[in-house]
Amino acid sequence: MKTEYQRPPVKVALMGLGRAMFSDHYPVYRSHPALFDVVAACDIIKERRDIVAEDYPNCRMFRQFSDMLEERDIDMVDISTCTLDHVKHAVMSLKKGFWTLLETPMALTLDEAQLLRGQAMKSKNRLLMLQRGIFAPDFLLARQAMGDERLGLIHQVRIRREDYIRRDDWQAVKRLGGGAAYYAMTDIIIQALRLLPSPPVQMWSELKRIASLGDAEDYVHINLKTRDAVSADIEFNGGALPGERSPSFEIRGERGVFKVASGASTGVLRVIDPAFKFPRRRSSVRTPEIRDMHEDVPVVDIEYSLSKGTMSGPSAFWKHVYDTVRTASPFPIRLEESIEAVKFSHLMKKTSPFGK
């Protein structure tokens, strides 16, 4: 990201000083003072407020969210609280007229998501969802590959997210809105929706608990079918050991496959040599000859890189946040996409044993 801007930094108020805030959000604010200035912070735990106070001596501290929202010298409220409170806290912020950056998932049900959408519309569409998956370099490569004619007719998109973690936090507890269907899948679903050529019309899903120490799922496998020939096979696995990881994206076509590892900025296109043409042949109902029907097919591996100048990774997301708040440029993640992701996440959750 650029470090010099003619416009002043966005004045940010932090709501919820937990792991997500300090791991994903806060380092960005610290690293880019020309873009963001933390002016207020709210959490019930004093020790966490003290961390912010040490870095930002002039930052105003609060225990109650409602008190912080009475401050007027704020441009954007960054909400990273318990999933159960996302809708409530976002509505409170939007009603005060602040730009509101909300951690995923935006809600637990489609009804809640629609309620939040209504409030966002009343507040001049100042709700920004923290969905960074569409800026991941491996996703951008997969989207680029979807239009590569060397793959031939594409029939399947495969997405994999794998880790091994024995979660023991509230994200592993059902009654607190935990479970991979919510904390992991909304970003992945948005990626799938952007890759598929048409909207899904059918979904199959399976949820399991593998390594998690709570009662919520840490494994989700879904298949999205469209009216076209392309389907999406998606899996999040919180119990996959290191060294046994699959490519994060595979684009499968009639002439080959594109593969890329998680977070990688280069992938491999493995296809039948584009210069090769099959000899003409057609199927027959006659008694077949006693022979092997396999053919010698020339296969080539082609390294795949992002187009020059493509912005990717977390820096691309946060640059868009700044530009939207400061210059009113369109935010690249439409609210309808986040709502659609919640619809699928809630559906897979409520139809599983983990939704009971």
Which stretches of residues belong to each language-model region?
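C-terminal helix-rich "cap/oligomerization" subdomain common to oxidoreductases
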Residues: 1-6, 76-78, 306-356
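N-terminal Rossmann-like dinucleotide-binding module
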Residues: 1-56
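Beta-loop-alpha module in the N-terminal Rossmann-like domain of NAD(P)-dependent dehydrogenases
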Residues: 56-119, 313-316
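Hydrophobic residues in well-ordered beta-strands that form the structural core
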Residues: 102, 127-129, 260
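Glycine-rich phosphate/pyrophosphate-binding beta-alpha loops
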Residues: 235-243
